[in-house]
């Protein structure tokens, strides 16, 4: 599957509005220009208006005149984060996007008790990869938000990822809780949690998906590896969602896919009242565009 299909899917929905916090960033403006060109969304850009216009004039001279674009000046990154979050809270926008603002600053606004977007559940990072040679999306969670989630948090992280998967057409996603081995070992918490999540799925506590674990990474994604080890499972070798036990595992796998496998990626923060595009400054404009498309699909489900 190609991530370009997410852009096509997103354009089929009713047009959404994206609120961008601190939009004075070259890659952000590039992604916004590409999104508008593809009729992906409308945008409200919060930030230093003079800098935003300067970036537009350098690369996209007519962009500022586009009727699908609104620029609202704010005096600081923190203020832009607050205004962008409030725009989503007040239903003036459907998606929140991070621009040139620290992650901690925008998350502080998202979690604000007065005007924030907390929905009572765990916020988690969900990344959708297009891996060369694979015939399906690889969905990875959580590589950026939850450091060492417990069983209850892993269950909610799974639900968040399943919701994202369904929004992009994976109707009954197969979830592999990842561990170092395929058997339950009382000395390895990841295997205990994986077994519990599998049982929860069978009892209907984790609905709308198929969960089976623990599974090592090779057995989760490769039918050949699973067959060699004699693992019989509805998930082994066919996993849509890789649920990692810790942020270190997720972060290393995320970056390995990008830098070693040359995978493409789009990612969102799920679990809030609206999807959040929280890409890093190192991410390309293409990756930001895929993340926008993913967020729009999620907001439209």
Predicted feature locations:
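Anion-binding alpha/beta catalytic cores of soluble intermediary-metabolism enzymes, centered on
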Residues: 1-235, 240-244, 249-301
């Amino acid at each position: 599957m190609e991530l370009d299909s997410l852009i096509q899917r997103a354009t089929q929905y009713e047009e959404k509005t994206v609120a961008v916090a601190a939009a004075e960033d070259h890659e952000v403006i590039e992604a916004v220009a590409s999104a508008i060109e593809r009729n992906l969304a409308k945008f409200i850009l919060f930030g230093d208006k003079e800098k935003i216009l300067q970036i537009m004039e350098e690369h996209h001279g007519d962009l500022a005149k586009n009727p699908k674009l609104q620029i609202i000046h704010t005096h600081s990154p923190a203020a832009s984060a607050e205004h962008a979050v409030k725009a989503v809270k007040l239903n003036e926008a459907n998606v929140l996007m991070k621009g040139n603002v620290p992650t901690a600053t925008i998350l502080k606004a998202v979690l604000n008790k007065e005007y924030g977007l907390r929905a009572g559940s765990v916020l988690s990072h969900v990344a959708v990869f297009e891996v060369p040679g694979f015939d399906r999306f690889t969905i990875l969670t959580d590589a950026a938000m939850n450091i060492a989630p417990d069983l209850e948090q892993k269950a909610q992280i799974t639900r968040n990822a399943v919701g994202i998967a369904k929004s992009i057409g994976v109707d009954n996603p197969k979830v592999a809780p990842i561990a170092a081995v395929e058997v339950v070992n009382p000395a390895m918490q990841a295997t205990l949690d994986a077994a519990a999540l599998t049982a929860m799925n069978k009892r209907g506590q984790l609905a709308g998906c198929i969960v089976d674990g623990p599974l090592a990474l090779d057995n989760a994604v490769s039918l050949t590896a699973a067959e060699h080890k004699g693992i019989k499972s509805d998930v082994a070798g066919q996993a849509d969602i890789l649920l990692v036990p810790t942020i270190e595992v997720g972060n290393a796998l995320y970056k390995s896919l990008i830098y070693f496998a040359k995978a493409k990626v789009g990612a969102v923060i799920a679990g809030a009242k609206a999807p959040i595009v929280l890409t890093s400054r190192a991410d390309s404009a293409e990756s930001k565009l895929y993340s926008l498309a993913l967020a729009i699909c999620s907001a439209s489900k």
